[in-house]
Regions:
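Interaction-mediating elements
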Residues: 1-114
Length: 114
């Protein structure tokens, strides 16, 4: 299950959260074998972030994926993710959005332990 976490300094209302979820979750299929039906998206707003030592509107997008992915998919997804944040939260400049990826070697679903 891909896990996407968005942390931002801004207030995220329901409309913005849904737009971000649709864009980031809906485009997870950029990564082979990663359908939207298997993605979890967490969005946190109003979190202090210091980017380059400066406080101000910013966002961190963390994407955790099981297994290595083709190199070109990381940049392609980052472009989609940055565009989605700028569109949903226009107070954030794209130069203040950081996208990080984590490759997972193990996975566990709650249902696996029932």
């Amino acid at each position: 299950m891909p896990m996407i976490e968005v942390t931002t300094t801004e207030i995220v209302d329901r409309e913005a959260a849904i737009a971000i979820k649709k864009a980031l979750g809906g485009n997870i299929s950029i990564f082979p074998g990663k359908p939207e039906s298997r993605v979890m998206v967490v969005i946190r707003g109003e979190t202090p972030i210091f980017f380059g030592g400066e406080e101000g509107p910013a966002a961190l997008i963390s994407v955790a994926l099981f297994g290595e992915q083709p190199d070109e998919t990381y940049d392609k997804y980052a472009r989609v993710a940055v565009e989605a944040i700028v569109k949903a939260l226009p107070t954030i400049d794209k130069s203040r959005i950081y996208v990080k990826y984590q490759t997972l070697t193990h996975k566990a679903w709650g249902k696996d332990f029932a």
